[in-house]
């Protein structure tokens, strides 16, 4: 599951490498449609989901890997973050993986006109709590098309439930 992956090319790359049972969720139907058009017939191989991640219901579907590059840090209120984590607990298979990318401790305070929450690995792990075993983390600078650098924190966990 690629959270916020609307116009991302991650799904293209995974399909090209032979991965199956892929899913993408984005709040923007236009972003999903853009990627479906880009993928053409290959789009039929992907499960597409449009909606707000804090209110989404995947039903009985379970995922081996949950990937979020830059959605979670937009959840600035505790209730939204709790709803997100509860959904991850429901949707990721036991012993599955969660890969998160958020703005790091020195990252921007807002993005696209919206406030964000910055994280270090301990704070992010605290948000997820028991049941998530931290396997590693890394700080990296992302060079934006605008010519600036944004600090990102990448964390990967294994669901231990």
Regions found by a protein language model. Give the residues of each.
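Class I (Rossmann-like) S-adenosyl-L-methionine-dependent methyltransferase catalytic domain
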Residues: 1-61, 75-91, 96-161
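Short catalytic micro-motifs in class I SAM-dependent methyltransferases
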Residues: 70-74
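A conserved beta-strand element that flanks and buttresses the S-adenosyl-L-methionine
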Residues: 67
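Conserved acidic residues
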Residues: 64
């Amino acid at each position: 599951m690629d959270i916020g992956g609307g116009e991302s090319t991650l799904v293209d790359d995974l399909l090209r490498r032979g991965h199956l049972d892929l899913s993408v969720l984005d709040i923007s139907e236009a972003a999903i449609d853009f990627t479906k058009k880009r993928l053409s017939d290959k789009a039929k191989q992907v499960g597409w989901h449009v909606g707000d991640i804090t209110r989404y219901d995947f039903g009985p579907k379970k995922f081996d890997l949950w990937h979020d590059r830059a959605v979670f840090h937009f959840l600035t209120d505790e209730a939204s973050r709790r709803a997100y984590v509860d959904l991850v607990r429901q949707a990721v298979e036991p012993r599955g993986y969660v890969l998160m990318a958020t703005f790091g401790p020195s990252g921007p305070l807002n993005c696209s006109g919206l406030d964000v929450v910055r994280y270090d690995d301990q704070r992010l792990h605290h948000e997820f709590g028991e049941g998530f075993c931290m396997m590693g983390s890394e700080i990296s600078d992302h060079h934006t098309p605008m010519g600036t650098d944004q600090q990102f924190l990448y964390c990967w966990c294994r669901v231990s439930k």
